[in-house]
Amino acid sequence: MFLQHGGIILAFLGAALAVGLSCVGSAKGTGMVGEAATGVLSETPEHFSKCLILQVIPGTQGLYGLVIWFFALNVMGAFSGGIKDMTLAQGLTIFAACLPMAIGGWLSAIYQGRVATASINIIAKKPDDWSKGIILCVVVEFYAILCLLASILLLMNAL
């Protein structure tokens, strides 16, 4: 069965990893920030919107993973009448094209969550300087965007 459908299996696995790992990383990252924010909000509930913005930032990688999932399924023909037959090499190409977003999205979401969690301390101590924490988070976001771009470009040239 793998020899007959191995290409399709690998392509689906790559797409699933792109969205799955990115969402796992985003869940971990946003969860860490939410935990840290509850302490601040118990003392100063007026900082809710600032804390919420920091919490949402690590969630973007999950969205990027979903974009790659759609791109991969589009390359496979899922939105144009049915999945195409593909060779093992073609499936491996799609699988490999999804890896930058899968691995990069997963790890960058966790590390961005750590930066955003630390940035919650800025809100607790100097609420007017909270935008500095956002800027620090954007540095990590840049690498998630590079992973997204790499996977998109690879998928555009996959077959």
Segments predicted by a language model, with ranges:
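Hydrophobic, small-residue-rich transmembrane alpha-helices and their short perimembrane loops
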Residues: 1-159
